[in-house]
């Protein structure tokens, strides 16, 4: 499922350091000649495509990126130090436009691809460069050049990792607002969600995944009923589907588990009618609204038995958050494992795969047993 993620940033490269007019002054050498050094180069700003990053959310809060200026030159032929460069890591698939003109500048579509967003200014020249046969004591020097400055628009078509599936009012929007930064409209009536919502779930500073909530499906969606069929095709690109099922029932005359099983079977049938491959995609069962159930464990057991379910199952409350942390961590571990498989396949296809060093393989035949003395130990 692809959504456009955008961020506008400003990049300012560093100014080059100034050259200097200086003359050698030592004892017994009254006319030592020019020895002014050049200024250092200003810091540049680069962008590198990183397959371990999947959104541009960090750039929405860090909009200004300014590199340092180069140092000025000094006497005794000392050049100024170059300023450190700044490298911005962006997701693979990021497109960079000039924010003022709309011109397409870069398309970072391969892991490790590096481009220059703003080049640092060159350092100025010291008076050493202006010495000639007719001018033995030049006093000229040049200032450092200004670094490039740009306003850039970063655009990424985000591929959602997790798709939420379920009937209208199953609690999908409540769940995505609970676990991510998305804030969809939530109300106690069906068809609250009229367009897809995208949320980023952060489990740590360096680990995250993207969840997509689409309008709820109803019976007959594969034939055009409701709104969900308009977005079913997008779920084909997700890695795992979360099938949300409401296990509560406001009607006291209705068995909530039997109704939930019937609703779940209707969703699976719509998937099969729309696309058999989509129905075979990895799917996890999420029983929602446990806060409205007297005995969640018994409800879970009854549902699994009647639904003949053998895959992963979680019981949560999207409203108060019960059980959502376990679901989030399980999803993150699963997606990380799938990403490692994809990275390995890509490295092998590109011919860049490097096997692990056998010295770090504890299962090799000549590995020392735990607690055994190492070489050099007494």
From Swiss-Prot:
Class in the EC hierarchy, top level: hydrolase
Cellular location(s): Cytoplasm
Domain Obg intervals: 1-159
Domain of life: Bacteria
EC number: 3.6.5.-
One cellular-component annotation, GO: cytoplasm
CDD domains, A to Z: Obg
Cofactors required: Mg(2+)
Disordered: region residues: 345-378
Keywords assigned: Cytoplasm, GTP-binding, Hydrolase, Magnesium, Metal-binding, Nucleotide-binding
Residues that, per the record, bind Mg(2+): 173, 193
Gene3D superfamilies xrefs: GTP1/OBG domain, P-loop containing nucleotide triphosphate hydrolases
PANTHER family attached to this UniProt entry: DEVELOPMENTALLY REGULATED GTP-BINDING PROTEIN-RELATED (PTHR11702), MITOCHONDRIAL RIBOSOME-ASSOCIATED GTPASE 2 (PTHR11702:SF31)
Subunit field text: Monomer.
Stated role: An essential GTPase which binds GTP, GDP and possibly (p)ppGpp with moderate affinity, with high nucleotide exchange rates and a fairly low GTP hydrolysis rate. Plays a role in control of the cell cycle, stress response, ribosome biogenesis and in those bacteria that undergo differentiation, in morphogenesis control.
Protein name, per record: GTPase Obg
Organism: Bordetella petrii (strain ATCC BAA-461 / DSM 12804 / CCUG 43448)
Lineage: Bacteria, Pseudomonadati, Pseudomonadota, Betaproteobacteria, Burkholderiales
Gene: obg
């Amino acid at each position: 499922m692809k959504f456009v993620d955008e961020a506008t940033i400003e990049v300012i490269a560093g100014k080059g350091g100034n050259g200097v007019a200086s003359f050698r002054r030592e004892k017994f050498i009254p006319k030592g000649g020019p020895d002014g050094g050049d200024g250092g180069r200003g810091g540049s700003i680069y962008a590198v495509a990183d397959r371990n990053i999947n959104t541009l959310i960090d750039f929405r809060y860090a909009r200004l990126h300014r590199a340092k200026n180069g140092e000025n030159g000094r006497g005794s032929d000392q050049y100024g130090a170059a300023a450190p460069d700044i490298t911005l890591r962006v997701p693979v698939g990021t497109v960079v436009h000039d924010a003022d003109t709309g011109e397409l500048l870069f398309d970072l579509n391969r892991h490790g691809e590096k481009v220059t967003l703003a080049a640092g200014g060159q350092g100025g020249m010291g008076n050493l460069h202006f010495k000639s046969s007719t001018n033995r004591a030049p006093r000229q020097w040049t200032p450092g050049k200004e670094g490039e400055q740009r306003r850039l628009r970063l655009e990424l078509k985000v591929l959602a990792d997790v798709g939420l599936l379920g009937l209208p009012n199953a609690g999908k929007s409540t769940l995505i607002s609970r676990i991510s930064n998305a804030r969809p409209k939530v109300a106690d009536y069906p068809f609250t969600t009229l367009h897809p919502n995208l949320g980023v779930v952060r489990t740590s500073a360096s680990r995250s995944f993207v969840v997509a909530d689409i309008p709820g499906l109803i019976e007959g969606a594969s034939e055009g009923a409701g709104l969900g069929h308009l977005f079913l095709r997008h779920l084909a690109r997700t890695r795992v589907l979360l099938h949300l099922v409401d296990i509560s029932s406001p009607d006291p005359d209705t068995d909530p588990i039997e109704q939930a099983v019937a609703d779940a079977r209707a969703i699976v049938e719509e998937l099969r009618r729309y696309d058999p491959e989509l129905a075979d995609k990895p799917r996890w069962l999420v029983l929602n609204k446990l806060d409205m159930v007297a005995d969640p464990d018994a409800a879970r057991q009854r549902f699994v038995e009647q639904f003949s379910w053998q895959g992963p199952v979680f019981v949560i409350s999207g409203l108060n958050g019960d059980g959502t942390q376990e679901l989030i961590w399980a999803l993150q571990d699963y997606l990380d494992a799938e990403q490692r498989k994809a990275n390995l396949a890509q490295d092998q296809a590109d011919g860049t795969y490097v096997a692990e060093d056998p010295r770090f393989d504890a299962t090799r035949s000549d590995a020392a047993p735990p607690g055994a003395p190492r070489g050099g130990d007494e």
